């Protein structure tokens, strides 16, 4: 489905995406389509029924059908140029998928091959492949201050002049944890990663092992950068599923999820065999989204079932996140965006599929173009990596799997529940009643996971009135602090200028 890297700023009005189902014969597998996404012509994702154990015979069969139909078209074209025979070249089988709960494949097939697939007894359903892209992409202004988002997740109450640029954290946060950033890639040579970022996999065929867009690098920096990251010791693996223009296909995204899940499983096995010292687990971030995709949601849920802790962006359409994927994947942590002024960001999706909020407006992080590049952009794409980093941060506070003090794994389900339980309740304004008003919290710098969890949640104090706030600000008159005060006031003003950050769109 059209996948938009959920970053920067969206168009505000969006129709709720829905599925349409095509059935020609009663016994044929249905073909699912999203009415809100731009389809990739003749490209499909095929999902097997639960009884299928060994898919290799089916893969051989579908390739033979594809080859036979291709040969017949070529023969027809040779016989007569007057016949209405397609000149399109169909690529055949593209990816195979094998995750717990999801087994299938994708490919580029003609209509005859598609009909044969639909009538095969192994096939549960077929989903039309569709485009994915970055959500937004406007070039925003850049602030030179430390990210306010890091400060916000480490403080319970609204940020003030004294706390707005102070991030409290455990020094070893992220140590021993791998984070798979499924995006446009990562500028792995950026100095902020200190050599902890590596290239994992490029899924789009023929694309370079580089981030030509910047979005993935920005997300990776928020996850694990030395200066800009939540979990400053975590290791990042770039999983490129979108091209440099920020777009791609659903089938490539699903393959990227599979790569991350299998890489995590391999890391677990290596740790058990003593080949990956100090390993504590894996998280993943996916700041992309679009129309509803049953296949992508199933892939994410399967990856979580395999032990991969997953954060996904809620979306930037100011609409119900349940109508978007992967935001609707129930096993993942679905993240909405908040502002410096403790509001729900005006673009952030909402609804019962949202699990938590994190900073997402005017977020400073790493960028492409040099080893020192930075950029400030906005979106739920920027909120989600705060949570992916926080999941890694929390995992790192546990003993390593090969340690004599190792404890039972914190399952993704348990850590998700704990993350929500310790969040700051009622922190934000403009949150619909059907949406959890919970802002992420990292424990305020504590390195004791048990202590953080036992502290539980927190309900914010009533915010000061505008008059009280103005009076308090007026009394800050210490000359040596005036420059910092100006920075804070400018940041607050910037957070309130909605139109400025969407290229003038209201």
Swiss-Prot record:
It comes from the Eukaryota. Residues 69-79 have a biased composition (Basic and acidic residues). Residues 147-453 form the Peptidase S8 domain. GO terms for biological process: proteolysis. SUPFAM superfamilies: Subtilisin-like. This is Subtilisin-like serine protease Cur l 4.0101. Pfam families: Inhibitor_I9, Peptidase_S8.
């Amino acid at each position: 489905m059209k996948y938009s890297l959920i970053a920067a700023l969206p168009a505000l009005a969006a129709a709720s995406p829905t599925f349409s189902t095509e059935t020609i014969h009663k016994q044929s597998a249905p073909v699912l389509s999203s009415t809100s996404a731009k389809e990739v012509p003749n490209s499909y994702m095929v999902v097997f029924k639960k009884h299928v154990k060994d898919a290799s015979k089916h893969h051989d069969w579908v390739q033979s059908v594809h080859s036979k139909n291709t040969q017949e078209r070529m023969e027809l074209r040779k016989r007569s140029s007057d016949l209405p025979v397609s000149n399109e070249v169909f690529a055949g089988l593209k990816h195979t998928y094998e995750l717990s709960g999801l087994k299938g494949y994708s490919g580029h097939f003609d209509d005859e091959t598609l009909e044969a697939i639909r009538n095969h007894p192994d096939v549960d359903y077929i989903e039309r492949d569709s485009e994915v892209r970055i959500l937004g992409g406007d070039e925003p202004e850049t602030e030179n201050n430390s990210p306010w988002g890091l400060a916000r997740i480490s403080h319970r109450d609204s940020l003030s002049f004294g706390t707005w640029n102070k991030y409290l954290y455990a020094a070893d946060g992220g140590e021993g944890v791998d984070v798979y950033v499924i995006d446009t890639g990562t500028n792995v040579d950026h100095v902020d990663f200190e050599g902890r970022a590596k290239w994992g996999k490029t899924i789009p065929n023929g694309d370079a092992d580089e981030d030509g867009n910047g979005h993935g690098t920005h997300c990776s920096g928020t996850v694990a950068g030395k200066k800009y990251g939540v979990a400053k010791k975590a290791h990042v693996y770039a999983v490129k599923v979108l091209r440099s223009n920020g777009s791609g296909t659903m089938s490539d995204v699903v393959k990227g999820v599979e790569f991350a899940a299998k890489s995590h499983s391999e890391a677990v096995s290596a740790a058990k065999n003593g080949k990956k010292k100090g390993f504590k687990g894996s998280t993943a971030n996916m700041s992309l989204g679009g129309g509803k995709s049953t296949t992508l949601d199933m892939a994410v849920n399967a990856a979580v079932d395999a032990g991969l802790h997953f954060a996904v962006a809620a979306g930037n359409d100011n609409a119900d996140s349940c109508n978007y994927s992967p935001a609707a994947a129930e096993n993942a942590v679905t993240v909405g965006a908040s502002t410096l002024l403790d509001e729900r960001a005006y673009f952030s999706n909402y609804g019962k599929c949202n699990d938590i909020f994190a900073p997402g407006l005017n977020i400073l992080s790493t960028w492409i173009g040099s080893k020192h590049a930075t950029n400030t952009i906005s979106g739920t794409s920027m909120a989600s990596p705060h949570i992916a980093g926080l999941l890694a941060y929390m995992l790192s506070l546990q003993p390593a799997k090969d340690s004599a003090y190792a404890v039972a794994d914190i399952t993704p389900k348990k850590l998700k529940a704990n993350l929500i339980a310790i969040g700051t309740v009622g922190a934000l304004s403009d949150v619909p009643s059907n949406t959890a008003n919970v802002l992420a919290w990292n424990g305020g710098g504590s390195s004791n996971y048990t202590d953080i969890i036992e502290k539980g949640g927190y309900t914010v104090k009533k915010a000061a009135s505008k008059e009280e706030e103005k009076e308090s600000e007026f009394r800050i008159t210490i000359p040596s602090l005036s420059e910092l005060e100006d920075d804070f006031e400018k940041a607050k003003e910037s957070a309130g200028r909605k139109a400025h950050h969407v290229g003038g769109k209201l």
